[in-house]
């Protein structure tokens, strides 16, 4: 009897260990979302152009950047200001932006980021696509108060000399301020091929790097860059194609979207290469990583990645960088996407997306399950 009991206990222990091992190996269940078709409310009979970017500040105010000059001429008199601030219910709180004294407003609005101090950063990619070089392009990043007062401009329009330039950027796609170090990370990707880092207060250049932590090429890249996902072996070419997004996680990992090479590369904040991941390909549609957001839990378990190829948001388990789910399909309906471009998340885990070209809208996706 004693032997029989021992055997049963041993079997139970082995079964438990096997179950725990299987659970540890299984990917986490992807969170699910429901679109809020009423968000946001656009007042004053305003018209939006291409909505190029979106961000959420420390108060859960949502900042939307759009391109008024992309609106058809017949509707342009009703164009909303380029910068719109909403609350989570979709109510407009403020609006501003455009050309002004003392700064170079972008020729083509591209990225917006609201930092932990609620300063609002604007980037542009005016001058693209055409041959890159001195005298062309939005070669600056702008920092504003939430009320639209200029605080800082890094760089000047048409002044970039390329990847080695420590004063100007060149048609930057995106920016992110790492609150812990007060450093501004720039996806300097339409005219250059680098991540550039500046002091967020003074604008002083600190460092830059290319793909795999390599030194970026001295010569300016073709504009637009040629997709090269199969060059350089299975990991792709040794330099970035188009650096379209950059984010830093709470644990200090820098995420970079290399749009034309379908790869997500991660680095330390000093620029040391860590790992690479790719979006899963579906059929013949080439994946296009274009933007990031993190889940709201303390460990930021999930990484959300804009995939402008099949027009969806991919969900990654951040620990393994395994793709475990997707949000959305291509189409015009609420919850669908057509040229989804950038994204953001609020403190409750809800997601916000920006669409250019056809749909020209911002959308909100409410977190309905987290695991």
Region annotations inferred by a language model:
Residues 1-7:
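N-terminal secretory signal peptides that target proteins for export/translocation
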Residues 8-21:
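Bacterial N-terminal signal peptides
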Residues 24-371:
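Eukaryotic scaffold repeat domains enriched in small/polar residues
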């Amino acid at each position: 009897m004693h032997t029989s009991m021992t055997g049963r206990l041993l079997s139970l222990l082995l079964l438990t260990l096997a179950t725990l091992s299987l659970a540890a190996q299984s990917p986490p269940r992807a969170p699910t979302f429901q679109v809020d078709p009423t968000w946001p409310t656009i007042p004053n009979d305003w018209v939006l152009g291409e909505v190029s970017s979106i961000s959420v500040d420390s108060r859960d105010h949502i900042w939307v950047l759009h391109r008024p000059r992309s609106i058809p001429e017949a509707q342009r008199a009703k164009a909303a200001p380029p910068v719109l601030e909403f609350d989570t219910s979709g109510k407009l709180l403020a609006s501003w932006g455009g050309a002004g004294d003392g700064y170079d407003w972008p020729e083509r609005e591209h990225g917006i980021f609201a930092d932990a101090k609620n300063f609002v950063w604007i980037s542009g990619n005016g001058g693209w696509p055409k041959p890159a070089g001195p005298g062309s392009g939005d070669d600056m990043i702008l920092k504003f108060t939430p009320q639209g007062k200029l605080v800082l401009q890094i760089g000047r329009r048409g002044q970039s000399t390329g990847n080695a330039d420590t004063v100007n950027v060149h048609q930057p796609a995106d920016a992110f301020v790492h609150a812990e170090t007060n450093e501004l990370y720039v996806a300097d990707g339409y005219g250059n091929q680098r991540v550039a880092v500046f002091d967020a207060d003074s604008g002083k250049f600190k460092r830059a790097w290319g793909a795999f932590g390599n030194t970026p090429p001295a010569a300016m890249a073709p504009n637009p860059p040629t997709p090269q996902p199969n060059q350089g072996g299975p990991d792709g070419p040794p330099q970035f194609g188009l650096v379209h997004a950059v984010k830093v996680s709470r644990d200090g990992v820098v995420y970079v979207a290399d749009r034309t090479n379908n790869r997500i590369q991660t680095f330390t904040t000093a620029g040391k290469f860590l790992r690479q991941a790719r979006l899963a390909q579906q059929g013949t549609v080439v994946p296009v990583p274009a933007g990031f957001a993190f889940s709201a839990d303390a460990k930021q378990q999930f990484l959300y990645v804009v995939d402008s190829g099949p027009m969806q948001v991919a969900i990654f388990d951040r620990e393994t960088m395994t793709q475990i789910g997707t949000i959305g399909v291509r189409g015009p309906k609420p919850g669908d996407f057509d040229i989804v471009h950038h994204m953001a998340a609020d403190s409750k885990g809800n997601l916000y997306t920006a669409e250019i070209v056809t749909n020209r809208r911002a959308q909100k996706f409410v977190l309905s399950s987290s695991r």
